Amino acid sequence: MRATWKGSISFGLVNIPVKVYKATTQKEIQFHLLHSADGGRIRYRKVCEKCGKEVSDGEIVKGYEISKNEYVILTDEDFEKIPLKSTKSIEIRQFFDPAELGLIYYSSFYYISPDKGGEKAYYLLKKAMEETNSMGIGKMTMRGKENLVALRPYDGGIVLAQLHYIDEVRSPLELPGWGAVAEITEEELELAKKLILAMKKPLKLEEFRDEYKEALMQLIEAKLSGREIVVSEGVEEVKSLIDALKASLEAVK
């Protein structure tokens, strides 16, 4: 596994050399865009809208728009001048109770492993967070952006969660019907609770597969071999909520 970031974790005067690795990977089926007339690959070129010429990556700079068609130009050298402690270090600003951080703030996850010479301090941090039921929060710069991150013990090591800043999270109060209270009967509530308890069991994520991807591969293989695609029938519609709950309970018995 290739490290995404290399630096150190600091808390107080303790400094721990570490490497950071992406915890997840995308396994989507990749498609190319083709010209329907002759099957040729569709290519995209970077063209200047002012002169109409195709430009190379070396000719491209970043610009911040201050008014229509007016920009402040920023070069790679400009970005390197920004004074950030978080470019080579994850500075833990504070520790907190994990229950205080809502799920909505989590973005992506990384594994942190100790680099050479950091094994003891790494284990000490992990063990201390476990025994105090604590998470750490701080910042790190990765791919040209300063990220808010949280650290917590996980499965024998430390995991880093990239977080959304508070101004990046939309308020659910903007949604119609959010928080609304509907009138339900006691029978409906009891049936719903029974259904939940009947469906409740220890979580085994390995039992869940990407069925859309599997169906897509079956479709591709069928088209290759010239076989007919069989479409399954839809689920029969149940008229009322109470009937749906009763039918669902019968199905899980």
From Swiss-Prot:
Mind telling me which InterPro entries this protein's record contains? Ku70/Ku80_beta-barrel_dom, Prok_Ku, SPOC-like_C_dom_sf
Q: Which residues form a coiled coil?
A: none
Residue limits of the Ku domain?
Answer: 9-192
Kindly state which keywords UniProt assigns to this record, in alphabetical order: DNA damage, DNA recombination, DNA repair, DNA-binding
| Domain of life of the source | Archaea
| Transmembrane segments annotated in the record for this chain | none
Query: Which BP terms does GO give this entry?
Result: DNA recombination; double-strand break repair via nonhomologous end joining
> Mind listing the GO molecular function terms for this protein?
double-stranded DNA binding
Q: Which NCBIfam families match?
A: Ku_bact
Q: Which family does it belong to?
A: Belongs to the prokaryotic Ku family.
Q: How does it assemble?
A: Homodimer. Interacts with LigD.
Record function comment: With LigD forms a non-homologous end joining (NHEJ) DNA repair enzyme, which repairs dsDNA breaks with reduced fidelity. Binds linear dsDNA with 5'- and 3'- overhangs but not closed circular dsDNA nor ssDNA. Recruits and stimulates the ligase activity of LigD.
This chain's protein is named Non-homologous end joining protein Ku
Q: Which organism is it from?
A: Archaeoglobus fulgidus (strain ATCC 49558 / DSM 4304 / JCM 9628 / NBRC 100126 / VC-16)
